[in-house]
C-alpha cells in the first residue's frame, strides 16, 4: 500500500475509503445527505474541491443525493462502467480521482441528467459557513 493510501485510510472513515478508493456504494436511504435540504455546497471528501450545489439537488427517490449538474463540469470526469453486469457512466472527481457515483439520463430539467452521488464521497459546507471554510466565492450561488 502506498504512503498516500495510508494517509487516506487515516483521514477517511472506512466507508468513505471504500466508496472513494475502491469504487464502493453506500446503502440507499441510510446515508448522510440523501434527504438533506439545507443550502450549501458539497465538496470532494478527499481533495475539498467544490463539486455540487444544493441549488441543483433534488429528491430522485433513489436513496442517494441526486443533482442535475456539477458546479463546474471541469471538476468531474465521466467514465464508462460495465461492472455488475450493467452499463453505466461512473462519475469521478478530477483532482483526487475519487469515485463519486454515477450519472444517468433520467433526470429533470434541460439536460435530463441525474448525478447519483454517494454521501460518503462528499462533505457538506453550509451556506453560512462558506466564507469561514474558504469557499466564500460560492456564496454567489445563493444570491
UniProtKB/Swiss-Prot annotation:
Location of the active site: 116
Domain MsrB: 5-127
The keyword Flavoprotein belongs to this UniProt entry's keyword annotation: no
Pfam families: SelR
GO CC annotation terms, alphabetical: cytoplasm
Keyword entries, A-Z: Oxidoreductase
GO molecular function: peptide-methionine (R)-S-oxide reductase activity
EC numbers: 1.8.4.12
Gene Ontology terms describing biological process: protein repair; response to oxidative stress
First-tier enzyme category under EC: oxidoreductase
Reaction equation(s) it catalyzes: L-methionyl-[protein] + [thioredoxin]-disulfide + H2O = L-methionyl-(R)-S-oxide-[protein] + [thioredoxin]-dithiol
Domain of life: Bacteria
Record family assignment: Belongs to the MsrB Met sulfoxide reductase family.
HAMAP family, A to Z: MsrB (MF_01400)
Record protein name field: Peptide methionine sulfoxide reductase MsrB
Amino acid at each position: 500500500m502506498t504512503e498516500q493510501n495510508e494517509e487516506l485510510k487515516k483521514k477517511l472513515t472506512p466507508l468513505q475509503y471504500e466508496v472513494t478508493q475502491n469504487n464502493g456504494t453506500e446503502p440507499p436511504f441510510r446515508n448522510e445527505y440523501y434527504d438533506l435540504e439545507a443550502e450549501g455546497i458539497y465538496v470532494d471528501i478527499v481533495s475539498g474541491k467544490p463539486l455540487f450545489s444544493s441549488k441543483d439537488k433534488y429528491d430522485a427517490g433513489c436513496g442517494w443525493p441526486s443533482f442535475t449538474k456539477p458546479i463546474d463540469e471541469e471538476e468531474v470526469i465521466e467514465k464508462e462502467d460495465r461492472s455488475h453486469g450493467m452499463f453505466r457512466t461512473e462519475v469521478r472527481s478530477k483532482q483526487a480521482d475519487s469515485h463519486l457515483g454515477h450519472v444517468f439520463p433520467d433526470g429533470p430539467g434541460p439536460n435530463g441528467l441525474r448525478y447519483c452521488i454517494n454521501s460518503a464521497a462528499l462533505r457538506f459546507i453550509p451556506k453560512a459557513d462558506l466564507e469561514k471554510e474558504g469557499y466564500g466565492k460560492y456564496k454567489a450561488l445563493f444570491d
